[in-house]
Amino acid sequence: MPGVLCEDNRLSTSRMTPPLVFEPLFMERVWGGRRLETLLGKRLEPGVRIGESWELVDREDAQSVVHEGPLRGLTLNELWTRQRAEVFGPGLGYAPRFPLLFKILDAQDRLSVQVHPPAAVAGRLGGEPKTEMWFILDALLDSDLYAGLKRGVTRADFEAALAAGSVAEKIHSFPIKAGDAMFIPSGRIHAIGAGNLIIEVQQNSDTTYRVFDWNRLGLDGQPRALHVAESLASIDFDDAEPVIAQPDGETVVACEFFRAERWTLDQPRISDGKGFAVFSVIEGTVRCGGREFARGAFFLLPANATDREIQPVTPGASVLRTTVPGQ
């Protein structure tokens, strides 16, 4: 089959052309807006409230596809399954899919109060665990986040508030600004407030249990489904009043699943290490592999890339660099 032979020839290339750029997948959401277009320059379907741009994803029902270059048209899963060591580097085991998922979230309205199940609970409920982090690209003056419970709130208090429709009063909330970050481990109840534009780095999972949705209707005009029993089984009721992530030098968040660093570039810098790195442009414009990337752009630098230099095009350009442990 000629198509298969062509694919095999491209995947057998000894040196990948850096960087790899993928087509974003835009998701309509009841809470979405248009800032992916107005602030980041992404082309959206007119009149649609886009809440999520999936920038890098390898799931059965959603695949990132290489946008340009010699590997154009190949999926992230094809690269992962057939050129894992070359593109992604050593030590990544035999997982069937790329382990992370990268999104941009545009919250014109509040997201639901929700939780992602810890691994032990996810297995019992038939879901997937999801630990994630948020990096705030842009926020309105009165924007806030919800994360964890207020101190002293018990499970009984929470269930009573659920019954009374006042659960938001039991959740810790705080103001937020551009440049802040928040770590959301599995089991932490959370919600994103209106006015936030957020980069989300997460485990490759799409399991979310909604516990409260602000009594609103979905895109179909009906109340969105809630998952109260699953949420109660997943919430860590000892998780009280977490704080905004406190950077350790350039490291914004480091956990067992990923490491995210903020680089502010006054001069060119080499991305070293044995494996791949995913770059998200936070401010300004950068250049890599002869291509320029503006705010909101994502690219994957392969493990076997020969040109690993990230250059600032505009003074003080800033990127979020995400890697996995051991690389």
Residue ranges with predicted function:
Residues F102-K103, L111, E132-F135, S173-F174, ...:
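His/acidic/aromatic-lined binding-pocket segments of jelly-roll/cupin-type domains
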Residues R151-A164, D272-S280:
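Short, basic/aromatic beta-hairpin or loop at an interaction surface
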Residues A161-D206:
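Loop-centered beta-sheet repeat module
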Residues R97, L105-R110, P118-A119, E128-P129, ...:
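Ligand-binding loop in jelly-roll beta-barrel domains
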Residues V4-V153, D213-F237, A260, G326-Q327:
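Transition-metal
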Residues P268-R269, G284-C288:
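Short beta-strand segments in beta-sandwich/barrel cores
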Residues I171-M182, G289-A305:
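Short acidic-glycine-tyrosine-enriched beta hairpin
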